[in-house]
Amino acid sequence: MSTPGKAVLRVRNLHKEYAAAGQTTVALNGIDLAIEPESFVSIIGPSGCGKSTLLQIMAGLASPSSGDVLFGTIRVQDPPRDVVYVFQQYTRSLFPWKTVERNVAFGLENKGTIPREEIVARTREMIGLVKLTGFERHYPWQLSGGMQQRVAIARALACRPAVLLMDEPFSAVDALTRAGLQELLRSLWHKLGLTVVFVTHDVDEGVYLSDRVVVLTRAPGTIAIDIPIEFPNPRDQIATRALPAYLDYRARLLAQLFSDEGLKTGEAA
């Protein structure tokens, strides 16, 4: 668990309610969470537990009903310049009329204060880091799903964010592409010293990628458990997943999720 003094992003007693058709639905109930610099934190939980809502509030894209989020010492009310969000639906977040190069450069150009030479250099650097050199002049619709998501990641990282928020970014690709994107993300995390908050439905993905996993209960979402994941680095898709410790973490997280759903191991659907 991170300490308040070290947190780059801090959620304090956060509640979120929605009103519809004369009824109030509580989505999040009393969330307290501190994210340390250069940590990789995954948030998992059942569908509808408020994972994406929490991430949107952390990004300044939605407002809490009560409680707050701090980026450093600044209360988040609008999207902070140094916090970047990668969406699940990459096909909707990329501009189909812009090339890979222009998509990646978009955030830098939008700042309006970065010299053109630096924009070109950083764009080229990020395209290289996500292994898309040679595809600079391609359009999103000419790329595979995994390549499109790499463009979205490159665009986010070109802005050199302090915090990268990712909402199920690999859920729409096949298993092999997902494994490749996982390796790419972990490599970039280490190389660039990123702070990552990663929402996923996939327990295995959370355990493999992270150095900490937070489990939310079914709505109204609260934190059920928050555990550190301690594996040696670098990790390996086969060897790491075969470690007894990996299987123990996985079993512990699944037990929590099953318990919240009122299920037992081996129970038929």
Indicate where each model-derived feature is located:
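Short helical segment in ABC ATPase nucleotide-binding domains corresponding to the A-loop/adjacent helical element
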Residues: 101-109, 120, 124, 228
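Conserved ABC ATPase signature
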Residues: 139-143, 147
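Helix-to-loop junction immediately C-terminal to a conserved catalytic motif
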Residues: 59
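Catalytic Walker B motif of ABC-type/P-loop ATPase nucleotide-binding domains
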Residues: 164-167
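Conserved ABC transporter NBD signature motif
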Residues: 67-79
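A short, proline-enriched helix->beta-strand linker immediately N-terminal to the Walker B motif
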Residues: 158-162
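Conserved ABC ATPase "signature" region
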Residues: 116-135, 187
